[in-house]
Amino acid sequence: MDLSLRVALCLSMLALCLAIQKEKQVRWCVKSNSELKKCKDLVDTCKNKEIKLSCVEKSNTDECFTAIQEDHADAICVDGGDVYKGSLQPYNLKPIMAENYGSHTETDTCYYAVAVVKKSSKFTFDELKDKKSCHTGIGKTAGWNIIIGLLLEKKLLKWAGPDSETLEKAVSKFFKASCVPGAKEPKLCQLCAGIKEHKCSRSNNEPYYNYAGAFKCLQDDQGDVAFVKQSTVPEEFHKDYELLCPDNTRKSIKEYKNCNLAKVPAHAVLTRVRDDKSKDIIEFLQEAQKTQECKLFSSPYGKDLIFKDSAVSLIPLPSSMDSFLFLGADYSNAIQALKEGVKEDDSAAQVKVRWCTQSKAEKTKCDDWTTISGGAIECTEASTAEECIVQILKGDADAVTLDGGYMYTAGLCGLVPVMGEYYDQDDLTPCQRSSSQAKGVYYAVAIVKKGTQVSWSNLRGVKTCHTAVGRTAGWNIPVGLITSETGNCDFASYVGESCAPGSDVKSNLCALCIGDPEKLSESAKKCSPSASEAYYGYSGAFRCLVEKGQVGFAKHTTVFENTDGKNPAGWAKDLKSEDFELLCPDGSRAPVTDYKKCNLAEVPAHAVVTLPDKREQVAKIVVNQQSLYGRKGFQKDIFQMFQSTGGKDLLFKDSTQCLLEIPSKTTMQEFLGDKYHTAVTSLNKCSTSKSGLLAACTFHSC
């Protein structure tokens, strides 16, 4: 072979290798021959120039999870119960898209779990014991988790927990006979119709599997009740069937909104967290939905194959979404209860609050508090306010003090306010009462150096300093006002360079940020909404103004707390409060002492937040701790809750005079006030302002 031919051959092989490397694929896991047939149809009809679809067949969902985890497959669409199971070890899968059952303009990513019975039967919900039951599958949402959880909650089903017997054994004693595909207890497989090894398998190889299968079990007179979704019963059969309501009434199939077991999250597409394939899967499915020949949501070989037939589209989930946030705290905790048993109320024994800290300095202060509190306070670690919110949602922490902007997010994620900070040292009367209607407030202000030419009316192109994206005084108020006045959602293009911790580190909103000057190697922490960014928070925004910016957005006390010798840090020790002024919304300026007349807004105080069922416990303990370590506490010489060493505003704002208990049942919106709540809601319509956690918590409302 001559040299030129060898070179040509090598180049051809190299080109082939590069082509193979560039070819992207999505390997879909299917669980039956009927799903495999549909998948092969999709391979032929859902062509994509850059991404190839292929099919991987396994016997059941668990095998698919293993295949995805071991990189033999990439994706599967499952119900909420399996979203939860797939997120656990050893699978570590995450949801990336949700089925939409509404329309392309009005999405609905939830469905209803219902109990379907024949009209000819006469029993009520409370008379389910000793009836024959048809279920979609073990661990599935509508067919198992919701109904079994409800039976336990209503104390119709007796189960002392896994230490006494398995949940399956307890359920097998409750129903006369059942078909629960995937169950191990023989009596729960008694009604199933699969042949040989396929009997009671958790796949379409079992005729009574899934929604259509559970309904067929009822149709075939094998069962007395089928636990399915609201759209399972075909319209032509509505005249013969009705819904069993938890209040012991019955209603027509069409009245599912008033007669259901629960409204639950949609089915979701799962993939690996490791070597993330999300982008390819989402891109393929989005393109597939645009192709008329590609029938993702029809099942010519059965029912609900690969996706539910009632789905109209697939919607990408926010990047911050995990299985817990997708399912919601109530449903996630309900599934956990099915594993551990319903615990007796132990609120009397709960004598501690786990406080979430957001920096090393906060953790140090919290550890000191723990030591002297006699175990009433424990500490958890996080690096941002949003991480603390998630910890509380997941039950890993109990409380944290938040700024109004983060409180807005926390409220939409399901947390409630417990204790509000109070700042007015000229009127301490509310602090001396056991109950008070007073509310703490502070002022959002725009701070500038005296002698500069900046005014509120000429902020275009100005270098700005913010406490963090999503915080009240440093972002929501000033950016909301500017956005409202200019009609421009693109705040980054309006101002010059900024430091707005929490922004995209590559954007000009992070251009002024410096990270932690003492840890230069941690460049990844630059612009982090945490103490890892030197320009984070009130004092951080003021430092940014001093060193780099032209205007700083903070609270009315920020200048006083960092000047005239109040802050010994090198950047602040020589600063004089008289060298700074406030920008007024009317275009004028005022001394920093005139904050009540020259401010951007009066805003709600920071507050302690927790889960609704922890509210009384947290309030009781914090009130007690304040009586000991507050400004007038009996043991304030040992520890002071509202004083910070090694930092500013640690755990609570240093300007806090006391914490006022917020009346029980007060919602987050009521505490923040309609005006502020509406302002933040409007600001969040600008996509650049909406945090990942907020997007996840508001994705759907089941």
From Swiss-Prot:
Keywords: Disulfide bond, Ion transport, Iron, Iron transport, Metal-binding, Repeat, Secreted, Signal, Transport. PROSITE patterns: TRANSFERRIN_LIKE_1, TRANSFERRIN_LIKE_2, TRANSFERRIN_LIKE_3, TRANSFERRIN_LIKE_4. GO terms for molecular function: metal ion binding. It is found in: Secreted. Residues 340-349 are annotated as: Connecting region. Hydrogencarbonate 1 binds at residues 136, 140, 142-143. Pfam families: Transferrin. Hydrogencarbonate 2 binds at residues 467, 471, 473-474. One of its GO terms (cellular component) is plasma membrane. Its main location: secreted. Disulfide bonds join 29-64, 39-55, 134-217, 179-192, 245-259, 356-388, 366-379, 413-697, 431-658, 465-544, 489-686, 499-513, 510-527, 584-598. Fe(3+) 2 binds at residues 403, 442, 538, 606. Residues 26-340, 353-685 form the Transferrin-like domain. Monomer. Transferrins are iron binding transport proteins which can bind two Fe(3+) ions in association with the binding of an anion, usually bicarbonate. It is responsible for the transport of iron from sites of absorption and heme degradation to those of storage and utilization. Serum transferrin may also have a further role in stimulating cell proliferation. Belongs to the transferrin family. This is Serotransferrin-A. It comes from Xenopus laevis (African clawed frog).
